[in-house]
From Swiss-Prot:
Superkingdom, taxonomy of origin: Bacteria
Primary role: Involved in urease metallocenter assembly. Binds nickel. Probably functions as a nickel donor during metallocenter assembly.
Stored SMART domains: UreE_N
Protein name: Urease accessory protein UreE
GO biological process, one term: protein folding
Length: 149
């Protein structure tokens, strides 16, 4: 079966308990794809091909399989670096370095998050920049900064 449209996010579905749910585990970078093949916890395989280019996949994207049946995407947790710069100068240094490495990042609440990378860890340690390693389940894929939007 090929699924072409996201029904809604599982968190936004009323009476979710009345549905039979199959879950497919996906990597965070799979969320950027318009065409995807998944295998569920029930052993079923489905193809996903989004017809609408404006639709995006995210953690919890649900597809209708039947009247009371859903396929829900669940993102596998990634090992992430979460950087907390002390001031604007440190933020600039980190942003410059990550930009030169062409790393996709997520910036939220004054913190920069990116996938685990040993080169980045060495740079952060060398410059005594605060960071934590965390296992994070991303809601949306990390993206490269796009100044055209």
């Amino acid at each position: 079966m090929v699924l072409t449209e996201v029904y809604r996010n599982v968190d936004d579905i009323p009476n979710i308990g009345s549905y039979h749910i199959e879950t497919a585990m996906v990597k965070s970078d799979d969320l950027m794809k318009n065409i995807l093949r998944v295998k569920t916890d029930h052993g079923n395989e489905y193809g996903i091909r989004l017809d609408n280019e404006d639709q995006i996949l995210e953690n919890g994207s649900a597809f209708k399989l039947g009247d009371k049946q859903l396929l829900v995407l669940s993102v596998i947790a990634d090992e992430m670096i979460e950087i907390t710069p002390r001031d604007i100068n440190e933020m600039g240094l980190v942003a410059h370095f990550l930009g030169n490495l062409h790393k996709p990042v997520q910036i939220k609440d004054g913190k920069i998050s990116l996938l685990l990378d040993k080169v980045v860890i060495k740079m952060l340690d060398k410059h005594d920049i605060n960071y934590e390693l965390k296992k994070v389940q991303l809601d949306q894929p990390l993206e490269y900064l796009d100044l055209t939007k």
